[in-house]
């Protein structure tokens, strides 16, 4: 069975720690997300001019697009402390209370995977976000009492890959919802070029662009591919990042010209050969591929849909015309008529 290549998955890996030195430190150094950056610049400057905590911010979109980096930049530009945690870690109300009561005025608290937060923990977050107050229940049974604790004004930055899983009360408390989009090849090229320069590796424009083309529109993946290509350039090349060494390295790693790996191609091939291009339900695909539904919906499908290889319909997933073309196959006549409508 073909397993997804971890290198081409947008979730963080332990080896990604090497990328921290390559991350932009200021908003002006951040490449891509032009609309989000422009708006954040206004909100940050306004908060600084007023001397107030910036409004609560929610970053949503596919993984690996820079949510954590933007949150860190926000704190740095605001000149405040940055505290980071994640939804699954906050198992009890006391866990969140301990963090909130230690925040200083205007600090930024970043909660990754906020959609996975315990509902009981989420409940105490509401008054904290709205009124900067914390209501804690002390004791049990008839002796239980509620204690209200005043908090310092702070900025909560939430990050999620599944906006639809956020409850409406929580989602509505974020004054600055911001969707992050996949990056263009040109933007990724700038990121790869900057990364190669910071690594001290000479690069040719065609070499960095080849990596950018295969990075699935995701900076995190671009950074991983860059490191692997540099390995090949140092060991099997002359130390320069050229198109030839990039193409050779990525091909050997199983990354095709669109950035698809064996798991992606298996998904497309399954739809074409076993289900005639669809429509087919996600549960059926999950069973056939031995992949969890979440993995298919959060990791595999977003990029395939963004590239126009797969479409989602009320009746299920369908292989699009470009998907058939990528496999080198002709679409069935029944599907061709749908494409032509």
Curated annotation (Swiss-Prot):
It is found in: Cytoplasm. Its EC number is 3.6.4.-. Gene3D superfamilies: 1.10.8.60, P-loop containing nucleotide triphosphate hydrolases, Winged helix-like DNA-binding domain superfamily/Winged helix DNA-binding domain. SUPFAM superfamilies: P-loop containing nucleoside triphosphate hydrolases (SSF52540), Winged helix' DNA-binding domain (SSF46785). Residues 1-21 are annotated as: Disordered. Belongs to the RuvB family. The RuvA-RuvB-RuvC complex processes Holliday junction (HJ) DNA during genetic recombination and DNA repair, while the RuvA-RuvB complex plays an important role in the rescue of blocked DNA replication forks via replication fork reversal (RFR). RuvA specifically binds to HJ cruciform DNA, conferring on it an open structure. The RuvB hexamer acts as an ATP-dependent pump, pulling dsDNA into and through the RuvAB complex. RuvB forms 2 homohexamers on either side of HJ DNA bound by 1 or 2 RuvA tetramers; 4 subunits per hexamer contact DNA at a time. This is Holliday junction branch migration complex subunit RuvB. It comes from Paracoccus denitrificans (strain Pd 1222).
